[in-house]
């Protein structure tokens, strides 16, 4: 009984970390992913909050700390730890999507990760979990912004060993975006100046409020620039 109550409380906590939305709601931008998007949500300083401020419109943020693409547990996965299950039906013009970092860091320790990366996305960007999910989103009529990986400032960090995998994932997601004009890859490789710790929290993994704001501004610019071309 205690175990069941613990699981129930955990799922309730995860559910409370994501925004709910009505299908008839006014928001047209949906954000999904892991802690890079979810961090600072409670304080109003997340990436999505920065997008809202830049564009002057609502963003529904369904991202969850620790979320992965490969997540087998059904209950907590449905609560958002499985990125694909963060999706909610709606008239989304835009979906902002990140993820895969936890699958690499926690799944293979940024060591022998070739197979894990291939399962996420193939070298040509055409196959894998990420292209499959992006294809589903495109079929629903949404344009997709794929966020690249936030680099460390070049100092000792728990994820410093993941740099090669992050670079390779960026290359593959860029190729995916080249296949479809409705998919936009946003590289974050130049967000953090070398040696500048101010774009990260003290763990040197997650973006600080400053880092989240910068990412959000860049997301908003992609939306603004793309929509200006269609007017």
What are these regions (language model features)?
Residues 1-32, 36-43, 49-53, 85-91, ...:
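N-terminal secretory targeting modules
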Residues 26-30, 36-128:
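Conserved SGNH/GDSL esterase-like catalytic core that processes O-acyl groups on lipids
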Residues 50, 136, 175-176:
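Alpha-helical scaffold elements within enzyme catalytic domains, especially in hydrolases
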Residues 83-84, 130-134, 170:
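Generic structural signal for well-ordered alpha-helices
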Residues 98-102, 133-166:
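Active-site segments of SGNH/GDSL-like serine hydrolases
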Residues 149-231:
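Catalytic His-Asp segment of secreted/periplasmic serine-dependent ester chemistry enzymes
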